[in-house]
Curated annotation (Swiss-Prot):
Family statement: Belongs to the peptidase S14 family.
Species name: Bradyrhizobium diazoefficiens (strain JCM 10833 / BCRC 13528 / IAM 13628 / NBRC 14792 / USDA 110)
Function summary: Cleaves peptides in various proteins in a process that requires ATP hydrolysis. Has a chymotrypsin-like activity. Plays a major role in the degradation of misfolded proteins.
Enzyme Commission number(s): 3.4.21.92
Gene Ontology BP terms: protein quality control for misfolded or incompletely synthesized proteins
Quaternary structure, from the entry: Fourteen ClpP subunits assemble into 2 heptameric rings which stack back to back to give a disk-like structure with a central cavity, resembling the structure of eukaryotic proteasomes.
EC top class, as a word: hydrolase
Protein name: ATP-dependent Clp protease proteolytic subunit 1
PANTHER family per UniProt: ATP-DEPENDENT CLP PROTEASE PROTEOLYTIC SUBUNIT
Coiled coil: none
Length: 200
């Protein structure tokens, strides 16, 4: 069963030179689609940041599409992706398919304003940063202060991207807060709900 979960489909393309095969993610990358599927961690962050930088180098004016299905994960890994999204010149359009929770929703709202979306049955979730520490009391206090600073930074960024006051964001993030896709639009996390693909 584990091998099936790690199976990556291959696609075959015909051209004048013959057949070429790609793993599905490489094929999507050619269409400027990055798929963030699973836990937000250092490995995922490295892959997503590298793909963002590669696509910007190819064409800094064409949008990049970041499709998200994630329960979240490590805050610093998510912030690395966030900073890269803001740093590159190419606009990043975000779309939630499935769920965007915790750092997943944070990355969803970090997309280009007007181009942040979710599919109709997507589940969105926001909360304050989580952490746990062990050790000497003085070290625990240092970590707690750092966690408070991270919480303030994330609150400011949600407020900036969602058009809310920091006080509103802090109240919402105080406990686990789930939203439907439509509620995500109303809160400012996303801009629209896609019922079907736009005609191109």
């Amino acid at each position: 069963m584990r091998d099936m979960l790690q199976l990556v489909p291959m696609v075959v393309e015909q051209s004048a030179r013959g057949e070429r095969s790609f793993d599905i993610y490489s094929r999507l990358l050619r269409e400027r689609i990055i798929f963030l599927n699973g836990e937000v961690n250092d490995a995922m962050s490295g892959l997503v940041c590298a793909q963002l930088l590669f696509l910007e180098a190819e064409n800094p004016n064409r949008p990049i599409n970041l499709y998200i299905n994630s329960y979240g994960g490590v805050v610093t890994s998510g912030l690395a992706m966030y900073d890269t999204m803001q740093f590159i010149k190419a606009p990043v359009h975000t779309l939630c398919m499935g769920t965007a929770r915790s750092m997943g929703s944070f990355l969803l709202m970090a997309g280009e304003r007007g181009h942040r979306a979710a599919l109709p049955n997507a589940s969105l979730h926001v909360h304050q940063p989580l952490g746990g520490f062990q050790g000497q009391a003085s070290d625990i206090l240092i970590h707690a202060n750092e966690m408070q600073e991270t919480k303030r930074r994330i609150t400011r960024l949600y407020a900036q991207h969602c058009g809310r006051t920091e006080a509103e964001v802090e109240r919402t993030l105080d406990r686990d807060h789930f939203m439907t896709a439509q509620q995500g639009v109303e809160w400012g996390l996303i801009d629209r709900v896609f019922a079907e693909r736009d005609a191109t």
